[in-house]
Amino acid sequence: MAQRMKEDMLVRQAKAVLDFNWTGEYTMPGPRLYPHQWSWDSAFTAIGYCRYDQDRATRELRHLFEAQWKNGLLPQLVFNPQYTSYFPGPNFWHAKESPDAPEHHETSGVVQPPIHATAALYVYRHAEDEAKAKDFLEYAYSKLGAWHDYLYRERDPEGEGLVYVRHPWESGMDNSPIWDQIMQRLHLRSDQAATTAPTYTPSPLRIARPVVRTTASPTWSNSSPTATTMRRR
């Protein structure tokens, strides 16, 4: 009985956090430090929502899919224009310079692990309204297909079934020390080097991670030291 009460309390607390961070369109990972929409954060969040709020789960994923690029890329980050002090912001990524970038959303130019099909399946399996869930799957199917086609086409040029990452943030293990030696072996031109806005000063509540900026369309071989993760099954 005591264990069940503890579990119920944890569930209530988790729901309270999600409710507090819900914007009406997506869930902020952290209202102060991370106020925008992150790709796989939203997928995991939708998996949680689908167990008690089907509409919110589908809205979370729909908002992310609305920012999908024309070439199928599902961005790691969708910016909320109400929060302009976050770094690196849209002016760092210059995503709008790509003809494939979405027209109505500012995004980053990198991706995160593709768990979105799993999230969509969870939404269907736990749906209270099956008809609505099927409508959502019909909407999401083409989005997910384009997303995975992008990964196979752009990130597996040798057809090995191994999708490579272009940036540590794409792995989901952003701050892992496994990247330290790899990043030290990269040599960038001056126009590719990390830049920091002159007016940007980190506070105790806003600590910027080290950033490496690549060109808009870097060409790395699959033998690159960053070629890792996601083997096709």
Which role does the model predict for each range below?
Residues 1-37, 58-59, 63, 71-77, ...:
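Low-complexity, Ser/Thr/Pro/Gly-enriched N-terminal "stalk/linker" regions
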Residues 20, 36-38, 91, 167, ...:
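Short, low-complexity intrinsically disordered segments
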Residues 6-14, 22-33, 119, 130-151:
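Long hydrophobic alpha-helices with heptad-repeat/coiled-coil character
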Residues 12-16, 20, 28, 32-34, ...:
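Generic detection of intrinsically disordered/low-complexity segments and helix-coil linkers/edges
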Residues 54-141, 145, 152-173:
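Helix-terminus loop motifs that line ligand-binding clefts
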Residues 25-43, 47-51, 88-113, 230-233:
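Solvent-exposed loop and edge beta-strand segments that line ligand/cofactor-binding
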Residues 24, 40-42, 71, 95, ...:
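Intrinsic disorder/low-complexity segments enriched in polar/charged and small flexible residues
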Residues 138, 148-233:
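Extended ligand-binding clefts on enzyme/binding-domain cores
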